[in-house]
């Protein structure tokens, strides 16, 4: 389990980051999550939440970077594909986004959506 990888300080940052995220304080959550990811780079969960915090705080370049790293570490993480597609849409790259959204749909079991 993820918590097994954390020391007390990192666990506390993870806990607070979740509270900030739930309170829609995405920039504060991202600051803490970046530290957690730095200490536990092999863990996908904190990195995915960091990407979501970046997305919701309109730090789309950073969100894209983290989502690509999540997918590199866990190629079947459906939500990362979906979020990457949405991030690329918001960045004005609809053709590139479509590929990731199709993959997300396929991973979810819905097959590729009609174009």
Task: Tell me the role of every PLM-derived stretch.
Residues 23-31, 57-69, 91-103:
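Structural signature of tandem alpha-helical TPR/SEL1-like repeats
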């Amino acid at each position: 389990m993820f918590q097994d990888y954390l020391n007390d300080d990192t666990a506390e940052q993870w806990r607070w980051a979740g509270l900030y995220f739930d309170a829609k304080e995405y920039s504060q959550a991202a600051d803490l999550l970046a530290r957690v990811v730095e200490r536990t780079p092999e863990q996908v969960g904190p990195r995915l939440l960091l990407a979501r915090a970046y997305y919701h705080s309109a730090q789309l370049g950073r969100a894209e970077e983290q989502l690509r790293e999540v997918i590199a570490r866990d190629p079947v993480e459906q939500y990362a594909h979906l979020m990457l597609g949405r991030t690329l849409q918001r960045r004005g790259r609809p053709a590139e986004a479509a590929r990731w959204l199709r993959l997300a749909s396929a991973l979810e079991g819905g097959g590729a959506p009609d174009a």
